[in-house]
Amino acid sequence: QEFNYLKQNIDYDKEHLERLLPNNNLNRYSNIRPYKDNVVTINSENKNINASWIHLPNNNNFIGTQGPLDTTIDDFWEMCYSYKVKVIVMLCKLQENNKIKCAKYWDSNNVKKFILKQINSEFDLIDGVKVRNFEIKKNQNDFFPNTVIQLHYTCWDDHSTPDVDSYNKLIKLFEFLDYYKDNSPVVVHCSAGVGRSGTFIALYNLYHNILRQIKDNQINEIKFSIMDLVRKLKEMRTHSVENEGQYKFIY
């Protein structure tokens, strides 16, 4: 009931639909578009790609975005460079069920406007989580390159939820993310940037909310509202937490 209420009153609400930017060829899916009032813009031509600001309490700032298209790889890296992004969380595979879900944006051959260099070999943080480190700069004379770490979670299928055993993997991922992110926004993407991405951001926020309450209050009762949290996410990026299964997984 909660999920259906949120879906009808936010995702398909006329007022919210009117907030969406018009469709263009930069969108992977025509029905998943950012809201006009919190779209992430990049410096060149005040251009936007399919990315939304997600601001949550306690300085938890995210950019929720789609998996880059071949035609938006440079825009994606310009966004990361402009906003000094330190961590990218990738929640999809390049292909799933024989369908392309995301361009291989970390292949330096696909990057034209920036110089992208992988700093060291990728490694497995834990089973199902690959870690890659990159350095990105505008040109050879750029003496202040941005270093970015990509956390690639590979065991979460589209429109689904991870198995229960994956909770420990997610917590490990949260801890690793916290170590690297500093005060910069964290880029989170899957394919559309709403289902898995919204669920991940909700879980990250709840995890820290619970830890903070335990530390600050030393109380036996933990208070939070999943419905309110998902409502906030949907108001910042349409269709965040895309289906009922993902909503239940948060619980």
Where are these regions (language model features)?
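Cys-based phosphatases of the PTP/DUSP/CDC25 superfamily and their flanking regulatory architecture
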Residues: 1-251
